[in-house]
From Swiss-Prot:
PANTHER family: CALCIUM HOMEOSTASIS MODULATOR PROTEIN (PTHR32261), CALCIUM HOMEOSTASIS MODULATOR PROTEIN 3 (PTHR32261:SF7). It comes from Homo sapiens (Human). It is a multi-pass membrane protein. A lipid is attached at residues 99, 200, 204 (S-palmitoyl cysteine). This is Calcium homeostasis modulator protein 3. Residues 1-20, 72-98, 203-344 are cytoplasmic.
Length: 344
């Protein structure tokens, strides 16, 4: 049980692990979808290629889009690309690294579908049965061109009366299936060789740029996630204070109207609504959340965060972004331990 808990915490704390898990899940779903798909070629001259190529390419496109939607870093990458520069310069290398990472994970499921379709051969036979050169097969010598086209269109349908138990149909189908499997295994081998070379040759080169881009791409993702969590915490605290303020104002209104008398005619004192002390949680890093206490301040803070990200320098002087909003991190006292989950 402890091992499962540690594994779950690892997936929670690592965005790359989550994205890799989603990538593997999409690949497994792709295999299941293809194995359960009912393939029915129309066996018509002008529709075989459309059906076969559509089945070969359309599901991979849908899986590619699903991979982009499931990957949170795709949205973070676009936001980093389109954000105003503000006080933080934009590094094209980080954006390229994030784009490469997103595309690699999004292309996994489409490649699985295409390779399965090529190794199975049904889509390829349906798509290219009408494009086979009849001169490669001796059985078409006594047929007219129209008969040859009709016969080739019926090749994927082995139960059709025109091609049932026909040696020519078996020869054409076997030829196309072998060609499809050869292409599938060639693509698989090329992908394995490319992955092997990338994995083995990468340590031979300078890793400085790679480590820097990987670090800052993770930073951009974690920064946005922590900002969202901090906004949620501030919204909760702000709502709590607004509710307390509402009850306090209602108490004052009840006092003004003289509605505090009990049934016996004596005056009843309403208990005071406790106001949140200003110094509450000052040592836990939450005191800075209470400085933003109006809708105008919240709107300005969010606008400033989008239009002018703070510089990546914690030693910079506060108030760089204008408006008196300081983006300087609160200083931690010596001996303070940082928990595994950041307190935001």
């Amino acid at each position: 049980m402890d091992k499962f808990r540690m594994l779950f915490q690892h997936f929670q704390s690592s965005s790359e692990s989550v994205m890799n898990g989603i990538c593997l899940l999409l690949a497994a779903v792709t295999v299941k979808l293809y194995s359960s798909f009912d393939f029915n070629c129309p066996c018509l001259v002008h529709y075989n290629a459309l059906y076969g190529l559509g089945l070969l390419l359309t599901p991979p496109l849908a899986l590619f889009l699903c991979g982009l939607l499931a990957n949170r870093q795709s949205v973070v990458m676009v936001e980093e690309w389109r954000r105003p520069a503000g006080h933080r310069r934009k590094d094209p290398g980080i954006i390229r690294y994030m784009c490469s990472s997103v595309l690699q994970r999004a292309l996994a499921a489409p490649l699985v579908w295409i390779l399965l379709a090529l190794l199975d051969g049904k889509c390829f036979v349906c798509a290219f049965s009408s494009s086979v050169d009849p001169e490669k097969f001796l059985d078409f010598a006594n047929m007219t061109p129209s008969q040859v086209q009709l016969f080739l269109a019926k090749v994927p349908c082995k139960e059709d009366e025109l091609v049932r138990d026909s040696p020519a149909r078996k020869a054409v189908s076997r030829y196309l299936r072998c060609l499809s499997q050869a292409i599938g295994w060639s693509v698989t081998l090329l992908l394995i060789i490319a992955a092997f070379l990338a994995r083995c040759l990468r340590p031979c080169f300078d890793q400085t740029v790679f480590l820097q881009r990987r670090y800052w791409s993770n930073y951009v993702d974690l920064e946005q996630k922590l900002f969202d969590e901090t906004c949620c915490e501030h919204a909760r605290d702000f709502a709590h204070r607004c509710v307390l303020h509402f009850f306090a104002s209602m108490r004052s209104e009840l006092q003004a109207r003289g509605l505090r008398r009990g049934n016996a005619g004596r005056r009843l004192e309403l208990p005071a609504v406790p106001e949140p002390p200003e110094g509450l949680d000052s040592g836990s890093g939450k005191a800075h959340l209470r400085a933003i206490s109006s809708r105008e301040q919240v709107d300005r803070l969010l606008s400033t965060w989008y239009s002018s990200k703070p510089p990546l320098d914690l030693a910079a002087s506060p108030g760089l972004c204008g408006g008196g909003l300081s983006h300087r991190a609160p200083t931690l006292a010596l001996g303070t331990r940082l928990s595994q989950h950041t307190d935001v």
